[in-house]
From Swiss-Prot:
NCBIfam families: PRK03708.1. Its cofactor is a divalent metal cation. This is NAD kinase. The active site is at D67 (proton acceptor). One of its GO terms (cellular component) is cytoplasm. GO terms for biological process: NAD metabolic process; NADP biosynthetic process. It is an enzyme of class 2 (transferase). Its EC number is 2.7.1.23. It catalyses: NAD(+) + ATP = ADP + NADP(+) + H(+). It comes from Pyrococcus furiosus (strain ATCC 43587 / DSM 3638 / JCM 8422 / Vc1).
Length: 277
């Protein structure tokens, strides 16, 4: 069994816990590699075990951080590697265990007392080309000029679904329904469902409403306004795009895999939503 370790880089407690996990696994006789960025912020790991995250080829990744750490892993790894996530963030919608339970969780993982929770992702094509990361949470099309709305049309499976004047449009997975989409007025969607959400950001008039569509759907977005936009993926990747761009969002063939110790969704998600608000 081979493990990879990735930690939140701006939090010393996360880096120290990552080292303790690394030491525990090495002493236990397992092969362990460490993310290069983690090492650069805490250079106490054996340098021979340090490789770029993009080159991880392991059985499990131990992620010590918040949702942002998980999103970084998902954007950079080339394989769908199961992630055991330790919460060193704020709310931690995606994380599984608290820091105090880290070594108990590792023991259960080693003993095979877990299951794999698979989550859908969405893939973005820009003028027919896929050159940006898949999104675990959402793809957001945003106004390139703060205070100026954008005018766009979006189509679902070839049919015009809506013409929107708004600050932008969010195309979200069920996992992302508790993030940007919810802030824009979208619903909570059980992450086990195979659906896609389309949520306008502050539309004018407010007749443009959020939609939940089948996960097999294709969403095509074109701009009516002659204005540059920003494409944002999971709040991690940003790119300015010209007004004549055509954007397509579909379900990705890849999935995110989480190590879980319980199949319970509720009340975890509902409690975290209340904490957030």
């Amino acid at each position: 069994m081979k493990f990879g370790i990735v930690a939140r880089r701006d939090k010393e407690e996360a880096l120290k816990l990552a080292y303790r996990v690394y030491d525990f696994l090495k002493v236990s006789g397992y092969d362990v590699v460490v993310d290069k960025d983690t090492y650069e912020h805490f250079p106490y790991f054996n340098e021979r075990d340090v490789i770029p995250l993009e080159e991880f080829d392991v059985d499990f990744i131990i992620a010590i951080g918040g949702d942002g750490t998980i999103l970084r892993i998902e954007h950079m790894t080339k394989k769908d590697i199961p992630i055991l996530s330790v919460n060193m963030g704020t709310l931690g919608f995606l994380t599984e265990v608290e820091p105090s339970d880290t070594f108990f969780a590792l023991s259960r993982l080693i003993e095979g007392e877990y299951y794999i929770d698979e989550r859908i992702k969405v893939r973005t094509y820009i003028n027919g080309e896929n050159r940006v990361p898949d999104a675990l949470n959402e793809v957001a099309i945003l106004t390139g000029i703060p205070g100026k709305i954008i005018h766009l049309k979006y189509y679902v499976d070839g049919g015009l679904a809506d013409e929107v004047r708004a600050d932008g449009l969010v195309v979200s997975t069920p996992t992302g329904s508790t993030g940007y989409a919810m802030s824009a007025g979208g619903p909570f969607v059980d992450p086990r469902l195979d659906v896609i959400l389309v949520v306008p950001l502050l539309p004018l008039p407010k007749t443009s409403v959020p939609m939940v569509i089948p996960g097999s759907s294709r969403v095509d977005i074109t701009l009516v306004s002659d204005r540059e936009i920003i494409l944002a993926i999971d709040g991690q990747y940003y790119e300015y795009l010209p007004p004549d761009v055509e954007i397509t969002v579909v379900k990705s063939p890849r999935k995110t895999k989480f190590v879980r110790f319980t199949k319970e969704i509720y009340p975890k998600y509902t409690m975290k939503i209340k904490e957030r608000h």
